[in-house]
């Protein structure tokens, strides 16, 4: 059995639906034989471990623990879904206060127990803010921490595929940037539909401007729609895409979608947000975005919204004033 690496991968929040799906996905993708499951809810965690044992996977060393020190010690890769789940009627931002405190503790635990970790993926919402908090308190480099942002882009591809009645693979380079929330910037200028630029189609009978606005709304409310349909928040899609991210960080195939990353350039400062990124063994790197004037204006609005959330966390006392960040994590300017 060949694996991408033999390094230890720890799944935080493994008793939950996202965490347990991440664990199974990581095994099925043959990322590493050394998988550790962590969750403070011991009975549920044991149940997940038992189910994975019952799958009969070959070559796996699956361990589980409710001791965070044991879980993180020696881990080279960590994916955390260890926050509260979003429920009906809630926005991602409604989760801010409780999950901000969880992110602070998580970051400090990473620093204490696995300072040599290679990459951390944070996916509990609001992921842009929980990822930022984790980065600050972990002491890691910005290139070592990413957040889940890709679902908005995959949802855009799905909506366009349904609208045009063609296979998703014929919809190329769908992108949303900025925040992973309803204030995200949905880009049309990057995408192609069966080889034709989406911008050339919008405003024609094939896709009227009104229909495009409706699609954008469906994308921004995609997570809420899953809750309405299933009675619970998404778990299959975030689990799969997050493991794709950590696989890329292990040296696997390139990650195809935007990721949330720490940004301190191009007019966006001291924030974690979705950018055009590349995730490799060397970490995550992003490049400047070029969109239409309308798209760039929307991106600035999304950034401003994230700054408001960040400043709320500063007011809560979970994050210190920005001027003090470098003293906590010298890797952050």
Task: Walk through the language-model features, giving the residues of each.
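Conserved N-terminal Rossmann-fold NAD(P) cofactor-binding segment
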Residues: 6, 31-75, 84, 311, ...
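Conserved glycine-rich cofactor-binding loop
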Residues: 15
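N-terminal Rossmann-fold NAD(P) dinucleotide-binding loop
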Residues: 19-20
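Generic hydrophobic/aromatic pocket-lining and core-packing "Φ" positions
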Residues: 23-24, 107
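Conserved S-adenosyl-L-methionine
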Residues: 28-34, 139-142
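Rossmann-like NAD(P)(H) cofactor-binding subdomain of soluble oxidoreductases
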Residues: 91-159
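C-terminal substrate-binding/catalytic lobe of Rossmann-fold NAD(P)-dependent dehydrogenases
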Residues: 138-143, 153-333
